[in-house]
Amino acid sequence: MLVLGIESSCDETGLALYDTQRGLLAHALHSQIAMHRDYGGVVPELASRDHIRRALPLLEEVMAQSGTRRDDIDAIAFTQGPGLAGALLVGASIANALALAWNKPTVGIHHLEGHLLSPLLVDAPPPFPFVALLVSGGHTQLMRVTDVGVYETLGETLDDAAGEAFDKTAKLIGLGYPGGPEVSKLAETGTPGAVVLPRPMLHSGDLDFSFSGLKTAVLTQMKKFEAAKFDGEALERAKADLARGFVDAAVDVLVAKSLAALKKTKLKRLVVAGGVGANRQLRAALSAAAAKRGFDVHYPDLALCTDNGAMIALAGALRLGRWPEQANADYAFTVKPRWDLASLAG
């Protein structure tokens, strides 16, 4: 089965072709980072308009890359939610228009299911079941993944997502957009232990997260720097140490909760997915813990940690392979800006 995947939930336009026999044939991605940088965050109206401009050129690119003709495609998968309503509508409209013109069925995909399954795109994919740490700008969850469509929420953030905390910390420190990669980069130059921040809910006894207090601690520390009248090189060094303290605290919590989830479920496989899954400090800490405690940890390719069409095409192929009745051939659709992953079922 050959599936075209279309991702448009936020500020990346992604298209890809995935074949159940040959794997990922082609994927192309356009990021809107440069467009939103002047605003310090994603502007939904601009995001929607840019998806309209980018989708068809990206379609032509993946078709040319793979030597695929429209008659070769069996179905079209699109991100149905969650995400920005306007952005989702653009992707859904394009998917259904193509499907109508080409006489193909469609299938709507949960954006987070795409992330959960994205590590299956690697050469040696993890078998089911596994624990998944889903960590991004909008979500931080621990899930037990028993099979495609069988997901149990073990823990989740009670306030800010980890990626959101990274972005807000970057803004408090005075870094550019997007903040997450910038604060991680700065943290690598900081001195370990120079600034020690709280580890929220580290010993809460459950698998939930909270990152709003960590963000507040960063703000408090920045005010101390101002009161001390740090400037020039001293201020830059203090900011680097603060970034290091923040990243160390966030990573400690993510690793500890992941280990607790593995212990609770008695599973030996951890899958890390979502944009923050590209963070080098997090990967290093989880890999070290895996080596010490004897479990396997799996990551998507770095290029597939961000939103992308490949994960949507894969999820579409897996769903239609197991539940052909989910194929939609009447081209009526809705989008779901809010959509609980645990509500999915085969």
Swiss-Prot record:
Assigned EC number: 2.3.1.234
Listed GO CC annotations: cytoplasm
Function of the molecule: Required for the formation of a threonylcarbamoyl group on adenosine at position 37 (t(6)A37) in tRNAs that read codons beginning with adenine. Is involved in the transfer of the threonylcarbamoyl moiety of threonylcarbamoyl-AMP (TC-AMP) to the N6 group of A37, together with TsaE and TsaB. TsaD likely plays a direct catalytic role in this reaction.
SUPFAM superfamilies linked: Actin-like ATPase domain
GO molecular function terms noted in the UniProt entry: iron ion binding; N(6)-L-threonylcarbamoyladenine synthase activity
Localization per record: Cytoplasm
Annotated keywords: Acyltransferase, Cytoplasm, Iron, Metal-binding, Transferase, tRNA processing
Pfam families linked: TsaD (PF00814)
Enzyme class, broadest EC rank: transferase
Amino-acid positions noted as binding Fe cation in the UniProt annotation, renumbered to this chain: 111, 115, 307
Position of the signal peptide: none
Keyword Acyltransferase assigned: yes
Family the entry assigns: Belongs to the KAE1 / TsaD family.
Taxonomic classification: Bacteria, Pseudomonadati, Pseudomonadota, Betaproteobacteria, Burkholderiales
Any single GO BP term: tRNA threonylcarbamoyladenosine modification
Organism (species): Burkholderia cenocepacia (strain ATCC BAA-245 / DSM 16553 / LMG 16656 / NCTC 13227 / J2315 / CF5610)
Cofactor note: Binds 1 Fe(2+) ion per subunit.
Residues the record lists as binding substrate: 134-138, 167, 180, 279
Recorded catalytic activity of this chain's protein: L-threonylcarbamoyladenylate + adenosine(37) in tRNA = N(6)-L-threonylcarbamoyladenosine(37) in tRNA + AMP + H(+)
Cofactors demanded by this protein: Fe(2+)
UniProt superkingdom: Bacteria
Gene: tsaD
Protein name: tRNA N6-adenosine threonylcarbamoyltransferase
